[in-house]
Amino acid sequence: MTPDTAWAWPWWSAMVAVNIINVIVCLTIFRRTTRSAGGFSNITDQYQKHMLIMGLIFTMVGAYRAVFVSRYLYQFAWFDVLANSSLLIRFFAIFAELSFAGLFAYAMLRFSKDLASNNHTNPALNFIESRSPYLLFFCIFTAQFFATIATINKNNTLFAIEETLWTVGFLLI
């Protein structure tokens, strides 16, 4: 530990501790859900299966990224090891971010189905209920290409496009 980074170790330790708790909670929920169904393959509700998988991916990648912190644009890494490679972490982030978007989109579609309204005369409201979750996922999916290329090329503009796509996706919902 150098004097330049001494301030960051408490922050890093807190982030790792929070993510350890997240992983424990995630695995507990996953285990209880699969055990009560008699195994993962016995879960008949596809919504529950997909949400479990996406939640597990998002939580595990989040924990990995909390341990191996990096800054893509400047290729800064917390540790000088291959596991802290910006490109490797970006690759994992693709799955985590798509899982995150999928969790939101899938939950919104389920709520829209379960809480169906009888008022379909308003086209804007009908669009928000039925199509915006797909557009959210599409925006986040498209953003992944810009983020990955920006990580390789170290291009600020591509990172800005990625963030803009995230913003557009969430403004749509």
PLM features per residue range, with description:
Residues 38-41, 75-85:
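Perimembrane loop-to-helix junctions flanking transmembrane segments
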Residues 40-57, 121-137:
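Membrane-interfacial loop-to-transmembrane alpha-helix junctions, especially the N-terminal start
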Residues 136-173:
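Elongated scaffolding segments in large macromolecular assemblies
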Residues 48-74:
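A generic, lipid-embedded transmembrane alpha helix
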Residues 17-21, 88, 92-99, 165-169:
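Membrane-embedded alpha-helical segments of multi-pass membrane proteins
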Residues 5-40, 173:
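First transmembrane helix
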Residues 5-7, 80-95:
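Short aromatic-rich membrane-water interface segments that cap or initiate transmembrane helices
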Residues 24-34, 64-73, 90-133, 141-149:
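Internal transmembrane alpha-helix with an interfacial aromatic "cap," most often the third helix
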